[in-house]
């Protein structure tokens, strides 16, 4: 056999991997130049136009081929050409056998495709050529071969130096794996493993500090007996007043503080009253005031001015005290009560003072304002001066205002009766008592000796100064109040608070909760966050809202930065509602009687044990049951011992017990728990559901730049408030003990922000000593001269141009005034100027009338 013929057969029997067989479409015979159309030599293209075959059986193609050989793709009518040595070709009935060259084999095997009208329809030449190229690529590669280009898997290992031989061996091994077909079976366990890796819980539950065990000493709390068996008719009050107390206020028996205070005050003695929160101190001074004023021989006239002055620290407490006095005065219509507080119109308050107010209830700041600016206010007939929540008045920095008020009262009225009331006795209250009270009687329900005190006795019990600070002081707590504490890492504070709110207010009936924060910015941030994520205003949840939102959730906010009308509306709405969550600052921590409050949550720890007592005192009032929860960080766990030193006993609630409520809501399910029931849960599912809730918060915060900036400002406010703890608590609450990245997580931020001080820094204008001189000496063309350098003429197109402001009245300019009308005034430059003319106004009015 000739060598050239042997090589031809060898190439035909063993095509190389890189050989590309030519696919020739019907009617496009490939001929070399100079060859006859019917024949050819080696290397020439054989025409593939078929001879009309003999009639074939129905359902068979004239080009049906059956090929046996290794690999998938062999079979009747197969259009795939396996790599390797092709098997012998078998001719089907009614078909024509050509030369077994790769080109002819491919052309014959494509007959089934050509007969399909869907595959090959009449197309433009360009589209047909693209289809032919696609067919080439389809038949060229094996069905099992992976794509030629693959992404290299990202490796997190350090680079390793390899030799040339190792590189070649690696390439050969990869090539064998690439070209060897391998069948992959996907099992259910692999799918679960992939879904399990989709949920990431490391950001919340990793790198957290260890939660310490609380070694709280068991202390015996100071208890007060709230109610007594004594009735109001035993005090010798007016019958109409007793009837009003029984019917309107629905009270028949007195509390302990009322039983001891009312007789002393009816005798005309000054008193310092100290009692626990919710014990009825407001009625303890309101009843004697009303009884003494209605019993005066000369009937009180409205124009007489104030006979009683009551000072309260907050506006909400002023409204509450005014409402109580107004109810007691229903039988005595000639006595007129009134209230003065910030946020109201001064003009209307001056009009009421001009008409006359007999019982005046006011905040210190607004009263000082009227003393300095209103001539119609006078205290010549004043008989009563009451300081309600005296410790809070001093805490808010009203010492100077109290001094101004006392000087104004002492200048017009020397003889009066003074009363101080507070739940805690501090050093500031003692100083105020020394200044304002005259031979006072100390009334404390904690002291058992007060029962033996006879009000008719002329002996006066002097006020004993309390210990320095609150270190050795003890506080009375209602017996029906249960106190709890939980230690939560900083990253989980937000999720833990949301889970606790859902647990109490969504899955339980008629729950009313008050959550205390340390600043107004924190209240606003959490209010908007919970309102948009936990609560759905409509039936279908909006974007970013959880579908599990229930109508039982009702969020309200109250802080000092709100308008007075809104504060009053929120206070009234929360007082009359059966359920809801009130997010507030310490503005609601003193004296407010919020009925049916079941839970008090302190998201930020109070600055003193006295503040802690006033916060939890919003629940369990007048014998009702209530509970409180204090949320602490692991570094703040020692605060429990500080509370125990003041005889405050708290019990611990585990963080896992709070987060497990998320398993009761199906909207917090992760991917791997989609088919499982909620009752069979474990710690991993609780973590994943907490991560889902945290993701909802973070998505809401990062949905816009404004919300991210808002969260950063709230974080800055938290840090500033954290730095204001007193020196006695600095070893527990110190800024250096905070992890800013973890704390930022509790505000929905994914990273710890930088330059927090730049967020609230106000831009200050540069101070120029002589601005007029600067304007005169400034050249008009100074900017153009600066732009021109020694290498440029200043005429290039890329030089920045000064943006001219549009003239008034033009699009983009400021609105045109009525007195400014365009009047043509051509000077040297022949430019249109603006001139004030009365004629222009008249012409404009005439034109508008014509239109």
Swiss-Prot record:
Domain Helicase C-terminal: 480-659
GO MF annotations in UniProt: ATP binding; ATP hydrolysis activity; RNA binding; RNA helicase activity
Extent of motif Q motif: 230-259
E.C. code: 5.6.2.-, 3.6.4.13
Residues with the Omega-N-methylarginine modification: 828
Alphabetized Gene3D superfamilies for the sequence: P-loop containing nucleotide triphosphate hydrolases
Region (Disordered): 1-196, 762-784, 804-851
Record-given protein name: ATP-dependent DNA helicase DDX31
Organism from which the protein derives: Homo sapiens (Human)
Lineage: Eukaryota, Metazoa, Chordata, Craniata, Vertebrata
